Amino acid sequence: MLKAVIVDANAISRGLLNTVLSEGGYEVVGQTHASTQGYALLQKHHPHLICMALEQIEDGHDIVEQIKANYPKTLIFMVSGAIDAATLQAALARGVNGFIVKPFKADAVLKTIKSTILALIKKQQEQAG
């Protein structure tokens, strides 16, 4: 079972995403409202993926860069109610792997995560030759 951490200042959003992931077969090992606490959960549980609200990604703590440097296999999904092209490009450049749009639709969230994982596996296989 793949492990996940959720970081979002909105408790309702955290709860909904927790339900979607849990019912989708993921083990949510922690959730919090702040990026620094999210990083502590990452250090403790070593999840396969972390879902972070846009606000936590942009809070000035360089959290994406820290995760990519120290946990390069952890997939980062940005969660936001509105993702414009500039935000999307900036997030991809920083190392975000995928995007989850609010309001959540369970099937769309799970499909996004699955397709990102499959694309990463395919890319790794192609690089391995």
Q: Where are the regions that the model predicts?
A:
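Acidic, metal-coordinating helix/loop segments flanking the phosphotransfer/catalytic sites
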Residues: Q31-L49
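C-terminal output helix
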Residues: A86, F104-I113
